Amino acid sequence: MTKKRKLESESNETSEPTEKQQQQCEKEDPEIRNVDNQRDDDEQVVEQDTLKEMHEEEAKGEDNIEAETSSGSGNQGNEDDDEEEPIEDLLEPFSKDQLLILLKEAAERHRDVANRIRIVADEDLVHRKIFVHGLGWDTKADSLIDAFKQYGEIEDCKCVVDKVSGQSKGYGFILFKSRSGARNALKQPQKKIGTRMTACQLASIGPVQGNPVVAPAQHFNPENVQRKIYVSNVSADIDPQKLLEFFSRFGEIEEGPLGLDKATGRPKGFALFVYRSLESAKKALEEPHKTFEGHVLHCHKANDGPKQVKQHQHNHNSHNQNSRYQRNDNNGYGAPGGHGHFIAGNNQAVQAFNPAIGQALTALLASQGAGLGLNQAFGQALLGTLGTASPGAVGGMPSGYGTQANISPGVYPGYGAQAGYQGGYQTQQPGQGGAGRGQHGAGYGGPYMGR
């Protein structure tokens, strides 16, 4: 029993704390409560921060979704964005005019772009290299340098020469150190180097077509034709420079004299001048014939040049030739041509006779032919010749020559027994050319009177 009581007392002691312990616990409780409260507050702050971050992330996600839907609504299916596409791929399909417009706008808005364009242009040979043509065969590189050094500093000069003879081929190249030098040189494209009037252009334009002196006029311009005059009868001993001074009295000359001989630099019988104004060209043509150093110069418009003059002369000669044949046709000849055509003319003349005229001629010969030594048979033969000429025989051998009756030896006393008229020219015997002359005489209307 005692043991049970002891155990119960011990269990009560363990189950119920002592007063000291209770007091100590009461002292420690406020501190623990404060710590717990702080922990609770910290946990609430952390939870609030996490909630804010979650809300912000959700808001950003919604904004991104809205942006993607708005931008992707018009460009669905495009994997690459425009900003990521290379700029050269965008410029490649553009035309030259579009690129020029873009570069011009960029150069106007951004000065650094304009400076960059100028730097590239100065470095490129395209804007600094010029081509000179029309040089004399004795031209050297020093002559080119002396002629072009006034326009700017020259970097390189080359006069193209023949490898065999060592003489100039008539052209060369000038390379300036700056673009301004080439521009100054091209302000006046024609220059006199030595005794030759030369012309220059940018080498990038390409080779010159046709006459090297006329070549600077690259494109056809009706206004240039109106301002260009053609001067003929220009002797080779005329100085081109003096000729230029002579025609400069009528106005300022833009080009000329053109058309000089490439080898000698002298005129080849003509010269071309292009005035700067139409009034000057008209003034030069007011007096078409001008006297210069004892020579009479003939001035025309450029389109009245040698080709047109030759064509006019050809037409004039053809007209004169036709006129001569026309006059001969009035005398009995036909259209111009060989002897066959002339014979056709006789046939045309024969057609003018009608049977009444033939009968009258026969009666005349019958009444007066005795005094002339002719008989009636000649009139009948002549009537047969004139009357049987058919209109269908025009252009060939006259019908009368093949269908005329045989003439007896007594008709033409001078011919005797020859068979010249038998069968016409086709049956003429060898060695009897006189019958041909007699046939012409009869055909022209006059009988052969004998010797």
Curated annotation (Swiss-Prot):
Spell out the residue ranges making up region: Disordered: 1-86, 302-335, 423-451
Question: Which keywords fit this entry according to its UniProt record?
Answer: Nucleus, Repeat, RNA-binding
* Disulfide bridge positions per record: none
Is the Cytoplasm keyword given for this protein?
A: no
Q: Which Pfam families match?
A: RRM_1
- Gene Ontology cellular component annotations, sorted alphabetically: nucleus
Up-regulation conditions:
By wounding.
Q: Residue ranges under compositional bias (Gly residues)? A: 431-451
Does the keyword Nucleus feature in the UniProt annotation?
Answer: yes
Tissue specificity remark: Expressed in shoot meristem and flowers.
Sequence ranges assigned to domain RRM in this UniProt record: 128-236, 227-314
Question: Where found?
Answer: Nucleus
Q: Name one GO biological process term.
A: cell death
Amino acid composition bias (Polar residues), ranges on this chain: 67-77
From the UniProt record, which GO molecular function terms apply? mRNA binding
The annotated regions of Basic and acidic residues compositional bias extend over: 25-38, 49-63
Q: What does this protein do?
A: Heterogeneous nuclear ribonucleoprotein (hnRNP)-like protein that acts as a component of a complex regulating the turnover of mRNAs in the nucleus. Binds with high affinity to RNA molecules that contain U-rich sequences in 3'-UTRs. May function in complex with UBP1 and contribute to the stabilization of mRNAs in the nucleus.
Additional free-text comment from the UniProt record: Plants over-expressing UB2A1 display severe growth defects consisting of premature cell death and chlorosis.
PANTHER family linked to this entry: EUKARYOTIC TRANSLATION INITIATION FACTOR 3 SUBUNIT G (PTHR10352)
Protein name (record) = UBP1-associated protein 2B
